[in-house]
Design a protein with these regions (language model features):
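Amphipathic, non-transmembrane alpha-helical scaffold segments
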Residues: 2, 6, 56, 104-108, ...
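An amphipathic alpha-helix adjacent to DNA-recognition modules
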Residues: 3-6, 10-14, 18, 23-27, ...
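Cytosolic nucleotide-binding catalytic cores of signal-transduction proteins
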Residues: 19-20, 127-128, 172
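A short secondary-structure junction motif
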Residues: 55-62, 87, 91, 114-122, ...
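Secondary-structure edge/capping motif, primarily at the C-terminal ends of alpha-helices
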Residues: 67, 91-95, 122-125, 151-155, ...
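Helical hydrophobic small-molecule/effector-binding pocket
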Residues: 72-120
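Amphipathic alpha-helical packing segments from all-alpha helical-bundle domains
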Residues: 100-125, 131-146, 176
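C-terminal peripheral helix-coil segments that are non-catalytic and often amphipathic
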Residues: 150-192
């Protein structure tokens, strides 16, 4: 029952965001739309921003669908793009409001989870410190999310497949090279 109620609140928020900015939506609007009282809302969420975060972390996380390997990262990234396209009004309203940080947090988290899986897979058999693997995943995370945010900002005009194809050209082989440079059993010398 609790999950159904949360989904009803999420659906109501998404429908309202198609008509007005988040700053203009009140909890009473959501509860009246769902036919429940305010206490029911507060039983599940602290405030509207908590609900917004729940939408991104629960609904959107399904977009990744376990595509966290080197062979499937492109599919995982495509599913993130697809989630954004399928929820365009919701994402754009969030992106263009003070609640943009929730969208960014969602993207950073999902892309990191996708990339750390790839880094871990590629690091098998290579002695690399955990903090260095995390650093590599963070580097790519910031690049990938920056590209996604620019894509959203520009109105999502470019086909996501083309962006992913271009990213693949950049990333192919580079992660392995980075892991080799971070090996703990060898010293890497930089060419000048």
């Amino acid at each position: 029952m609790s999950e159904i109620t949360k989904r009803a609140f999420a659906s109501s928020l998404k429908k309202m965001l198609a008509k007005k900015p988040l700053e203009k939506i009140r909890i009473i609007d959501i509860t009246e739309y769902c036919g429940v009282n305010r206490q029911t809302f507060y039983y599940h969420f602290k405030d509207i921003y908590d609900l917004l975060e729940w939408v991104y972390t629960n609904e959107a996380t399904k977009a990744l669908g376990g595509k966290k390997t080197y062979e499937t990262w492109q599919q995982g990234f495509k599913q993130i793009f697809q989630y954004i396209v399928n929820n365009k009004e919701f994402v754009l309203t969030t992106f263009n409001s003070v609640s943009r940080e929730y969208l960014e947090r969602y993207l950073y988290n999902e892309v990191y989870l996708l990339l750390i899986g790839v880094v871990e897979e590629k690091a098998k058999g290579i002695p690399v410190r955990e903090k260095d693997k995390s650093f590599i995943a963070d580097f790519y995370k910031y690049a990938f999310v920056g590209i996604v945010l620019d894509w959203i900002k520009s109105g999502m005009k470019e086909e996501s497949d083309k962006i992913i194809e271009r990213l693949n050209k950049l990333i192919y082989g580079n992660m392995e090279e980075a892991l080799e440079r971070y090996r703990t059993d060898k010293t890497y010398s930089y060419k000048k």
